[in-house]
């Protein structure tokens, strides 16, 4: 299996090289050269546990890693999850399920991909006898999950940019209280979009990337999206057979990577009926899927901070398929978008995609309603998924974070403050963070001084 850039101006790579590279040298994002058809394999995959299913799925793409080695990497990636199902599918009512994706070490769905990515990096460092420096930007959960995927690993250093004062206190503590010498929490003055823009400019500096063997953990990394395909497949296989063909996955998302993974799985032959994109008040994706226009707005802080995003980095992968896999067209559109901050899609399948937008008042109301009706405590991001469910479909709401990560919001909504032992332990640890300006030069200078 080879992987190509959405912009078509760089050679195709094998899996390990595409993962290590992160962002393609031409500024594009890697995708499989061909999309495999899994439809004939679905019956064979039924009944597999999560790690075994992930091994079988990743084996289709990671063809340059021996099967036994890949199996060990995958198995090790899910040993720190606290629920034996890894991704339990909870029925709440007839035709309504919650897929819990927060039983990993940082209590967020990002652990599914980033525990695996950390082990893939460790394998590459050992196999190639090289060090690697990892750079990422986060609006909340990605940074903590990336750090806990690489914490203390020999031959690695990880640098995570996040908007100072715009992540929850617990999210910041998960990044800045590790005490690990290879972890650097970089609090930048600006928004997540500012951090992501600076990150892309740093990666565009080919000399700097090469000198420091720089790689990415953001959802621009191919391995992230592929790993996230697995929990859609796992949930689909655990639904009653009569419900599978009518399932709509409801996905709280700001960066589009989570829903993109499900859509890619659908393109691999898994019969998923549709996807509902659930946004908070930062609603660029809601506007895209209701009007066809993708236009950047101003980021507004919300009760669901991990979705406080206006530039979705995985937009380019969706664009590549929507524009008929035409790299020249992708280059032209991305240049136009960079210049104007807007793009209008000529068409997309509105029967597959729908969207909802939830403001802070509604988030609090939905948390209370879901708790009252179903006895279920949803975090603020998951709450966005419960708005305007389609009664004609089987709804699977992706629960993307533990409610314990947002105690103030939950307490205000239902009068009970959720807790988790791993989060309580963080409160006594010192915060070690580095405040930086959100400029490529400042970030490069810091990495120069700390890289392995």
Regions found by a protein language model. Give the residues of each.
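PLP-dependent amino-acid enzyme catalytic core
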Residues: 1-452
């Amino acid at each position: 299996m080879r992987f190509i850039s959405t912009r078509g101006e760089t050679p195709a790579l094998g899996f390990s090289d595409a993962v290590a590279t992160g962002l393609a040298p031409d500024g594009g994002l890697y995708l499989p050269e061909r999309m495999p058809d899994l439809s004939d394999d679905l019956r064979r995959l039924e009944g597999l546990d999560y790690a075994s299913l992930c091994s079988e799925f990743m084996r289709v793409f990671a063809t340059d890693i021996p099967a036994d080695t890949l199996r060990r990497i995958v198995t090790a990636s899910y040993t720190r999850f606290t629920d034996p199902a890894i991704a339990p599918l909870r029925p709440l009512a007839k035709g309504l399920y919650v897929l819990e994706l927060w039983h990993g070490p940082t209590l967020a769905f990002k652990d599914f991909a980033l525990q695996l990515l950390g082990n893939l990096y460790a394998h590459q460092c050992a196999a190639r006898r090289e060090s690697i420096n990892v750079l990422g930007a986060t609006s909340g959960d990605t940074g903590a999950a990336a750090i806990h995927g690489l914490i203390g690993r020999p031959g690695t250093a990880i640098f995570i940019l996040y908007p100072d004062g715009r992540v929850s206190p617990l999210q910041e503590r998960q990044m800045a209280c590790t005490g690990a010498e290879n972890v650097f929490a970089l609090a930048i003055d600006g928004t997540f979009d500012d951090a992501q823009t600076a990150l892309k400019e740093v990666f565009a500096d080919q000399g700097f990337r090469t000198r420091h063997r720089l790689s990415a953990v953001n959802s621009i990394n191919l391995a992230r999206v592929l790993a996230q395909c697995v929990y859609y497949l796992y949930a689909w296989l655990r639904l009653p057979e009569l419900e599978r063909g009518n399932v709509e996955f409801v996905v709280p998302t700001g960066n589009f990577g989570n829903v993109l993974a499900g859509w890619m799985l659908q393109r691999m032959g898994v019969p998923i009926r549709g996807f509902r994109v659930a946004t908070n008040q930062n609603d660029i994706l809601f506007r895209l899927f209701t009007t066809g226009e993708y236009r950047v707005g101003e980021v507004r802080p919300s009760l669901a901070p991990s979705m406080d995003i206006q530039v979705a980095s995985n937009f380019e992968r969706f664009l590549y398929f929507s524009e008929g896999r035409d790299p020249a067209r992708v280059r032209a559109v991305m240049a136009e978008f960079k210049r104007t901050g807007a793009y209008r899609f000529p068409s997309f399948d509105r029967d597959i995609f729908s969207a909802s937008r939830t403001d802070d008042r509604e988030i609090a109301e939905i948390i209370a309603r879901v708790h009252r009706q179903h006895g279920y405590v949803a975090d603020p991001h998951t709450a966005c998924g419960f708005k305007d469910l389609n009664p004609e479909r089987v709804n699977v709401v992706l629960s993307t974070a533990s409610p314990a990560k947002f105690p103030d919001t939950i307490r205000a909504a239902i009068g009970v403050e959720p807790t988790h032992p791993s989060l309580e332990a963080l409160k006594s640890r010192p915060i070690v963070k580095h405040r930086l300006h959100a400029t490529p030069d400042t970030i490069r200078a810091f990495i120069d001084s700390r890289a392995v």
